[in-house]
């Protein structure tokens, strides 16, 4: 089956991305402004697309490759997250924690594969993105959170992963706040400034990769044994196409009813002054994940800013409103004040949202579609680690390579179909509300 594929939704501003805004101005973007030909086109300049384009170039140095992004690389979704390369299975809320030892270990291998790939690139090219292999703290704020961490620890023990317990005094020595009652430290997580990383990955692509930004694809049209990609300013004719569009895949072609674009929101403070740094205490850089998945993620950055992330909203049109952003900012200010009462004069400078691509069964899309296009879509909340790994692996698969990780992705379930709108809107939004309410003090 080979039909036209139309694109209707593109990245929206969705607030002011503090990661992007706090960087020096970006260099001028190269846009699609004429007709050109490439062997491969990768659609989507997030972490998945950046890794897919690079891996294609590494394995096929004689091929011509275009990487096309609708906005600026680093300003949209991949540069809007909290900057965690998470290596472990993500859901710590359930008592059983994980499915099976074998499946969880496979997920760890998959996620670490992506982390290792990107870390090597950062080191080889000296990408300035505050990459840190300092691990993360899973912190609790009450007895319910402490119980969740105990279940998490049981799961880690079953799969043979290292961790360390911290009591209230120990986690306060790290964070400067006595808000947390205790924490569990896991060493395998890396953290970054995500917008800086995306810019750096784009700027260091191999010579046979051409990067186009501010160039949304409006239509992919089959023409003989090629594909014609249409843009406002021109066209690209390609032999093969890889889709790495994550949440935006929910708005086009073949799998849309199984994908859930769920926004999460973050705020970044202004830099603290010397007096404020002294009042806070703790260490210069740390990363805290809440014991409840719907709770508040907090990072202290080496720039003396603090990043706060919480609140979720199902937005199937892949954009948020001013009211969404205002609500998120209010929640962030409240969460910040509860954790850092000593920093009452520290303002939130930026607030923004970004879409996750979730599915009801943690399914994802990987491989060759019925229309002949390749795809790697659906990171289920672990965009940096899963996206980097699946991007690298889809390139290998498309070039005919196979390995245990490729086979693992080919066997994973597809996203489970959902009820029609507006039923799914009501169901997902109600579920989010209930889970946020249940998070309680963790928010």
Regions found by a protein language model. Give the residues of each.
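Active-site substrate-recognition segment that forms the wall
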Residues: 124-132, 217-219, 235-275, 279-369
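Glycine-rich active-site loop/strand segments that organize a redox cofactor
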Residues: 80-110
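Flavin (FAD/FMN) cofactor-binding and adjacent substrate-gating region
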Residues: 2-15, 21-22, 91-97, 119-200
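Extreme N-terminal leader/targeting segments of oxidoreductases
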Residues: 1-40, 58-59, 63
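C-terminal catalytic lobe of FAD-dependent flavoproteins
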Residues: 314-436
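Glycine-rich FAD pyrophosphate-binding loop
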Residues: 57-80
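Glycine-rich Rossmann-fold phosphate-binding loop(s) that bind the pyrophosphate
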Residues: 44-48, 70
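Helical element adjacent to the flavin cofactor pocket in flavoenzyme catalytic cores
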Residues: 147, 154-155, 179-239
């Amino acid at each position: 089956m080979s039909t036209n594929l139309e694109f209707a939704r593109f990245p929206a501003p969705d607030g002011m991305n503090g990661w992007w805004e706090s960087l020096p101005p970006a260099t001028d973007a190269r846009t699609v402004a004429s007709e050109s030909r490439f062997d491969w086109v990768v659609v989507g300049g997030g972490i998945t697309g950046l890794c897919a384009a690079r891996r294609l170039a590494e394995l096929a140095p004689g091929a011509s490759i275009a990487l096309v992004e609708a906005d600026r690389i680093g300003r949209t979704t991949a540069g809007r997250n909290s900057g965690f390369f998470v290596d472990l299975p993500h859901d710590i809320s359930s008592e059983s924690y994980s499915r099976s030892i074998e499946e969880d270990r496979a997920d760890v291998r998959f996620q670490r594969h992506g982390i290792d790939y990107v870390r090597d690139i950062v080191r080889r090219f000296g990408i300035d993105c505050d990459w840190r292999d300092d691990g993360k703290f899973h912190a609790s704020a009450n007895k319910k959170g402490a119980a969740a961490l105990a279940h998490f620890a049981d799961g880690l023990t079953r799969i043979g992963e290292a961790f360390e317990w911290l009591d209230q005094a120990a986690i306060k020595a790290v964070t400067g706040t006595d808000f947390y009652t205790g924490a569990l430290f896991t060493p395998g997580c890396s953290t970054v400034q995500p917008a800086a990383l995306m810019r750096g990955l784009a700027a260091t692509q191999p010579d046979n990769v051409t990067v186009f930004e501010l160039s949304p694809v409006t239509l992919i049209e089959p023409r003989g044994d090629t594909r014609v990609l249409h843009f406002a300013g021109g066209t690209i004719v390609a032999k093969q196409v890889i889709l790495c569009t994550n949440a935006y895949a929910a708005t086009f072609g073949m799998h849309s009813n199984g994908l859930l674009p769920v926004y999460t929101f973050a705020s970044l403070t202004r830099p603290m002054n010397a007096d404020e740094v002294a009042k806070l205490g703790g260490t210069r850089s740390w990363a805290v994940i809440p014991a409840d998945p719907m709770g508040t993620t907090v990072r202290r950055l080496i720039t003396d800013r603090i990043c706060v992330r919480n609140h979720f909203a199902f937005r199937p049109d892949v954009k948020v409103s001013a009211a969404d952003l205002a609500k998120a900012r209010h929640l962030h200010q409240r969460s910040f004040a509860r954790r850092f009462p000593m920093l009452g004069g520290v303002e939130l400078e930026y607030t923004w949202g970004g879409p996750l691509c979730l599915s009801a069964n943690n399914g994802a899309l990987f491989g060759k579609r019925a229309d002949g296009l390749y795809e790697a879509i659906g990171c289920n909340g672990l965009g940096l680690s899963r996206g980097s790994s699946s991007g690298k692996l889809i390139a290998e698969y498309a070039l005919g390579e196979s390995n245990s990780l490729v086979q693992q992705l080919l066997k994973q379930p597809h996203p489970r179909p959902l009820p029609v709108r507006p039923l799914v809107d009501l169901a997902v939004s109600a579920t989010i509300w209930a889970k946020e309410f249940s998070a309680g003090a963790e928010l």
